Amino acid sequence: MRPTRIGARCEPPVPATALAPIRVAVAGCGVVGAGVLSRLLPDPRFEVTGVLVRSPDRVRDVPGIDFAAIADRFTADPAVLLAAKPDMVLEILSEADAGHALIRAALERGIDVVSANKQAISQDPAALKSLAAAHGAHLCYSAAVGGGAPMIETLRAALAAGPVIGFEAVLNGTVNFMLERLDAGASFDEALTEARGAGFAEEDPSSDVEGHDAAATIRLLAFEAFGAAPDGAAIPRVALCAERRPTVGSRQIGVCRRVVGGLMAEVRLDADGS
């Protein structure tokens, strides 16, 4: 009886060829940027090619990061950051214009960009997406909206099932944390101090408390839902301030929906959260 032949004889298995690490440039070294660095530096899958900061020589103390060992990779010049030819730029700057300029410069060089800077992306998301496509690059910005909450992914899933009519959501963690503390009897200044201590509020909280951050989030979500974004300057905003204490139970809500002739959007404080 002949043996059954399954196929041609295979060569003995050999170890897989090691993949080259992904070359990553990090723009921004604040709370989020430093956290990203602490994850990337010890991971052999990644090579940090540069870090963009305002003051490269400033002494930094973050647990788990030996800044002295990577001091030569710090720069204040975006051109130097990109000259290292990273595969990807992680853009985590706090400035809208600087972030926007860096994103454009990277995409024009065919470098993939992952951004957590909603103020930068929301300036012109359609143009940035087109720029990325024109140069064969990828632009991802889920981190710019909702922190760890998959807001953009949720909208995309809803859109795949049918047209989106509108959305309402709590879009800013700082303001809603402060509203909870105000409900508990804290003063505005106390609530703001606690928000900073909890890692919610920036040193300059104006973007949050004046509603600019929520308005930028609305623009990004509207772009995903409707393919167009309302003018950020034209979005009505109710600010949270020390002079006017909100009604107990208030929440800051971002709203955008289709209306005849376009989109209606606003940032409001609602006592019932609806």
Regions found by a protein language model. Name each.
Residues 2-109:
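N-terminal glycine-/serine-/threonine-rich beta1-alpha1-beta2 phosphate-ribose binding loop
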Residues 27, 91-93, 116, 123, ...:
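Structural motif
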Residues 27, 31, 35, 76, ...:
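Conserved active-site and cofactor/substrate-binding residues in soluble primary-metabolism enzymes
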Residues 33, 37-38, 87, 129, ...:
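Predominant activation on well-ordered alpha-helical scaffold segments within soluble catalytic domains
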Residues 98-105, 118-155:
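Rossmann-fold NAD(P)-binding glycine/threonine-rich loop
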Residues 112-114:
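A short hydrophobic/small-residue beta-strand
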Residues 164-176, 236:
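NAD(P)-dependent dehydrogenases' Rossmann-like dinucleotide-binding region
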Residues 181-182, 190-274:
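Substrate-binding/catalytic subdomain of NAD(P)-dependent oxidoreductase enzymes
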